[in-house]
């Protein structure tokens, strides 16, 4: 058994604070109770015996969030306008693979390498042919799970794209 599930927790009053308990319950129901669910938080909400959050782990997590934010932002700006349907998603998959390989080998973990990767990511997405038509811009607000999970929002993003919205 070489797997664990990490989830961030803020301890706030939103539904996300319950996710850790729901994940554990789901794992038990699936006969996977041996998989530890580790709370990543800075407020001491839970103790995780046998595991310590180290500075290199924190650094990788921060870099992963920054890479993820950049890719989501550029993909969301390009996808509604792409001329070749699916090209943005293929680019996301390609960069996801490159970054996973980089994280495993330690590449892309310096500020200089990250900056270079940021420039490459932006340049690659910029090669995707797009239309310059004006589209209605829609912002989805609300609870984080509902905003970002197709299951939680009944595939809202796909619906909005099919209706010609950004």
Predicted regions and their residues:
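An N-terminal assembly and electron-transfer interface module characteristic of large anaerobic redox
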Residues: 1-166
């Amino acid at each position: 058994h070489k797997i664990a599930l990490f989830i961030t927790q803020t301890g706030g009053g939103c539904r996300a604070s319950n996710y850790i308990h729901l994940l554990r319950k789901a794992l038990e129901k699936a006969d996977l109770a041996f998989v530890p669910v580790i709370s990543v938080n800075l407020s001491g909400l839970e103790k995780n015996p046998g595991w310590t959050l180290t500075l290199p782990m924190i650094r990788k997590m921060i870099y992963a969030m920054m890479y993820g934010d950049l890719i989501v932002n550029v993909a969301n700006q390009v996808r509604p306008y792409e001329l070749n349907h699916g090209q943005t998603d293929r680019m996301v998959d390609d960069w996801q693979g490159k970054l996973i390989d980089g994280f495993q080998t330690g590449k892309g973990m310096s500020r200089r390498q990250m900056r270079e990767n940021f420039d490459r990511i932006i340049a690659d997405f910029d090669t995707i042919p797009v239309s310059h038509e004006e589209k209605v811009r829609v912002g989805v607000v609300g609870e984080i799970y509902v905003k970002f999970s197709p299951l939680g929002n009944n595939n809202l993003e796909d619906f909005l794209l099919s209706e010609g919205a950004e």
